[in-house]
Regions:
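Short secondary-structure capping/junction motifs at helix and strand boundaries
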Residues: 68, 83-95, 128
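Short, internal active-site loops enriched in acidic
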Residues: 99-104
Length: 177
């Protein structure tokens, strides 16, 4: 099943969502982006959407990002994006990404441009029926983000490390970090 996402003011197939190094220089090279990640339940209903929007918009504000859309507009766009998808077989993951665009100074650190909004839809992980019978194994990985309130790609290093150390190398089903 192909999913539809929202990228830069239009709906497109998820596999066509991309960031251009020049257009999104601050996001790709400088890490000037924030995101939140949530799931759907009960045939496409987002879980804790208001909480996630408050968090991602609060993170954007703390990074002095210019966000063109209001919370209510983003909430509506999330629902519009979900409406582009089918939920008769599988639930989905939703990533709301605010990605920095082009710098305006020679240091390539400052911009007065609004961030690009992405609402990326991917399939949720499916567990086998045996997983529901026997349970799943959860491996622990100790990691403390430098800033516990701010969720950016560079603060997500612990998650990447946990997946490799706990899930891949220690053969757990999931990692808690």
């Amino acid at each position: 099943m192909k999913h539809i996402s929202y990228a830069r003011d239009k709906f497109i197939p998820t596999n066509e969502v991309n960031l251009n190094v020049i257009d999104n220089f601050l996001s790709i090279v400088r890490g000037y982006q924030v995101f939140t990640f949530l799931k759907t339940v009960n045939k496409g209903k987002p879980v804790f959407l208001d909480y996630h929007l408050d968090r991602v918009l609060g993170n954007a504000k703390s990074m002095n990002m210019i966000v063109r859309q209001s919370k209510e507009e983003i909430k509506s766009l999330v629902q519009d994006t979900l409406n582009q998808n089918r939920f008769d077989e599988i639930e989905c993951n939703i990533m709301i990404l605010l990605a920095g665009t082009s710098p305006i100074d020679s240091s390539a650190l400052i911009t007065d441009m609004p961030v690009d909004l992405f609402i990326i839809i991917t399939p949720a992980k499916l567990y086998s029926s045996k997983s529901y019978e026997r349970g799943i194994s959860l491996g622990l990985f100790e990691y403390e983000r430098p800033d516990g309130e701010l969720k950016t790609p560079f603060t997500y290093f612990g998650g990447l490390k946990a997946q490799h150390a706990v899930v891949r190398e220690a053969n757990y089903d999931e990692a808690l970090y």
